């Protein structure tokens, strides 16, 4: 995998607000920043939703609500299609400080569309996604789980792929 040296943002504190669906909207993130969070995560956003609302990025977007005053910020995305994930990430490149690929969510509705921890069952596809994402100028991080079950632990394999 071709790797570029990318700068992760310097944090004002070690407190990090994790992504929480239905909770970490822009108002809550701004409040947490005021209360000392060094960086905040957005709620996770599907690559399909980002692509659907691409013409509204930077305006009153119902999906991507990052504002300059809250930065640094991490935008977490999920999906299952290599090209769609890349296209969605490209839309927010430079508008967020880190793009985090969610490969850990076990929610049935996310698994049903092949996203989240479903990607742990196809490490070749995950590698292709990360190779594409690594061509962007924005730093990439990956949220993972140990595996899909106690007998299928793949965390070290995923970490090696992500490190490449």
What do the predicted segments below correspond to?
Residues 11, 68-71, 112-113:
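Short glycine-enriched loop/turn motifs at secondary-structure junctions
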Residues 14, 19, 159:
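Small-residue-rich anion-binding loops in enzyme active sites
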